[in-house]
Amino acid sequence: MPLTIEQLKQYNEKMAAKGEEDDAPAPVLLLDKYRVRVLPLTSIPFVMNHSSVSQLSLSSEDVLVVDFPSKGTGSGAGKAEKKMIFKKKIEPMEDSFEDKENVNEGGPLMTSFLTLEKLRKGMVGDVEIIGYECETSFFDANPIPLSDGVSLQRYIRLNCSEHFSPSISTLPVWISTTSSKFPSICWLAAGRTNRNVQFAAATRVLGHFNNENSERVVKQLNQACGTSQLNKYRAVYEEIRKIATENRPAPGEVTIDVRWSTKSTLVLLEHPDNAADCTIKIDLGWGDKRFFVDDEIFEQLFFVLNLADVLANPDNEVIFPMAPPANFDDLVQEMDALVEASSREDNVFVSNENFRGGDITDKVWNIVRKCNDVKQVTLLFRNFLQALAYGKIKSHAQERNKSHLASLIRISKSSEFKIPVLERLSTIDMMMEIGVESLRRRVIDIFSSQLLYPSDELEFILQTCENDLPAGNGAMNSAAISLLPITMALATANRIYELLNEKDHVILPDLTRRILQKYTASMIEKSRRGETETEYTFETTLPLLRMYKEGFMSKRPCIWTCENSNTVGANVQARVLTSLELQPSLEHINRLVNDSRPVWTATEEKPAMIKDLNADYTVVHTIFSYLPKM
């Protein structure tokens, strides 16, 4: 029975829902031997590095990927290899004379541990440590031996209609293959373009970067495309890597995608020229504090959101961020000292614009947020409110301060004041309000002082966002939620600020305005649908001349590509993609290349050379051939 698109989509859904400890779902099989999946072309390793996948002009954005159902299927070589390696590892231990670890007879065991300090000390010069504290995520592929892959490709071409339904028979087919020698072909592809032109493609791994591979690539390009071809270069720099940790399960990332073209002779790992365009892609993730210049802003934002969540869902618990927890007696003394200081000052004549010392409610917030539980907050609030009732507080709250505590401070100076009843939710509400006011003023101040953004305009955006949020959230709830897109916009704009030349900071207000509009509009739209906005991404393209390239280009590009094409008239006969990657996403390719990669040690007497660093790259070559209609 022919395979259908519904079967393939159901398999993808089951794989996406599978937990780490769950068994893998039964694959969709071809000839009871090969796994078949439907995947977007943009997810295929090496091909995904193409600057514009649409230029390949394939019949579909999705492709069929064929491989084995599991690793080692169809061959016992994998198991035998593991056994052999294990045996080699234990052989030295069989001879006691070979164990030189305990060099002092009768003495303690002599050991040496590799630390980050030692690693950095050994890396002399400008050498980065790639992949430290990082788990690599590999593409799910169980490759087929190359000879079988070639036969399977021919079989599918001749018998496609017997095994695939019409809905998938027109999709291009990518077969995952492997071979033990270089050049190792890892992908075989075939299909038709959107103009019904037949194409064939192969991705070959040449090995690690060296002069031999470099010369081979240049020679093949000249043969395929001629010596006067236009070279389209691309270099991707990772400014912040997407590394998940226990405390950062949803990390963000920042990449700078640099693209330029030349008609000069191809040079691998060519540096971008000044006419290059840089696409900055920022993904803040969720709860990733690396994007926040001020850690306190990060902590206070998510603490305020937690308070708002507890008010909306009273059964939830307040999670206080302080670690280690503060001593409550010390907090009582801080509150007493604040009351004493407030009894000696009168800020009634201080304007909102010139107020920089911190509102009285800011100072209360900075004390109560260090508590360990709501009961402690209630006791501290009562101490402060009793001082208000006795007329000890002479300080005034700012006019724009809309919190309930600020209203109580104003009332205490003009009429008879009664201490309100503080229960659990009323305490949390009062705490959230002063937290919102404190964070709002801090964020506005950074926007205006560092990013040159008008404070009045930001106040208007905040108020508009608060008003446009669904009324069901409650007034102060909306005020808390409206801080999220504004603070995320601050983190995004700050990252762009660090990537620009100092003289080009004048474009920041316009970029910041675009970020604010995007984040607030997305927040409001999702809130109206009852969803929570947790995706904050921004992308912009700037000329390299505006970028502080000495900063991000001090790191090596994680991906470097060159694209060429050979045309006859208006028809493209071949496309060639040369790709150099520091960390290919195919596990078997990593193992194959690493086995042949040279090992070097940098010392002060012999620092790392450029050729040593370049050997970290894996060189891959993909050629698309388009067969003209006869």
From Swiss-Prot:
Principal cellular location given in the protein's record: cytoplasm
Known role: Essential component of the mitotic checkpoint, which prevents cells from prematurely exiting mitosis. Required for chromosome segregation, the assembly of the dynein-dynactin and mdf-1-mdf-2 complexes onto kinetochores and spindle pole separation. Its function related to the spindle assembly machinery and kinetochore-microtubule attachments likely depends on its association in the mitotic RZZ complex. The RZZ complex recruits the spindly-like protein spdl-1 to kinetochores.
High-level lineage: Eukaryota, Metazoa, Ecdysozoa, Nematoda, Chromadorea
Pfam families, A to Z: Zwilch (PF09817)
UniProt keyword terms in alphabetical order: Cell cycle, Cell division, Centromere, Chromosome, Cytoplasm, Cytoskeleton, Developmental protein, Kinetochore, Meiosis, Mitosis
Compartments where found: Cytoplasm, Cell cortex; Chromosome, Centromere, Kinetochore; Cytoplasm, Cytoskeleton, Spindle
Quaternary data: Component of the RZZ complex composed of rod-1, czw-1 and zwl-1. Interacts with the spindly-like protein spdl-1. Interacts with NDC80 complex component ndc-80.
One biological process term in Gene Ontology: cell division
Record gene name: zwl-1
InterPro entries: Zwilch
GO terms for cellular component: cell cortex; kinetochore; RZZ complex; spindle
Phenotype upon loss of function: RNAi-mediated knockdown results in embryonic lethality. RNAi-mediated knockdown results in defective chromosome segregation, premature spindle pole separation and incorrectly attached kinetochores. In addition, knl-1 localization to the spindle-associated rod-shaped structures but not to kinetochores is lost during anaphase of meiosis I. RNAi-mediated knockdown also results in abolished targeting of the spindly-like protein spdl-1 to the kinetochore.
Family: Belongs to the ZWILCH family.
Native organism: Caenorhabditis elegans
Protein name: Protein zwilch homolog
